[in-house]
């Protein structure tokens, strides 16, 4: 589902992704506050699908903001093999691992994944887990609640 919001003009490029972290104190008096913040869910990763040309003033972004259309971003994570079934809806939980230097750590503990998501596809790449866990790399899409 597409949503309308505002984003810094320098960041407003089709295809860019961002994780919405919530409003800042400086946003309180702004007349665009509702457009910027009311359509987005904190902690969700979004992808910009279109950018409008008009530029609007903003006290946070030096070069102003642009109106953009966004959708929840599809992205890749790693989960336990037994949970990796295409089309299934799951509630996210990180893989239990504390090896922060592991090449897979960021995919096992992804930022911007919260709540429920749908397994869009199971990727064919083999995941090598140093702890011996049976893992799969998958592509996911957040489920709108």
UniProtKB/Swiss-Prot annotation:
| Cross-referenced InterPro entries | UPF0179
Similarity comment: Belongs to the UPF0179 family.
Q: What is this protein called?
A: UPF0179 protein MMP1679
Q: Which organism is it from?
A: Methanococcus maripaludis (strain DSM 14266 / JCM 13030 / NBRC 101832 / S2 / LL)
Lineage in the entry? Archaea, Methanobacteriati, Methanobacteriota, Methanomada group, Methanococci
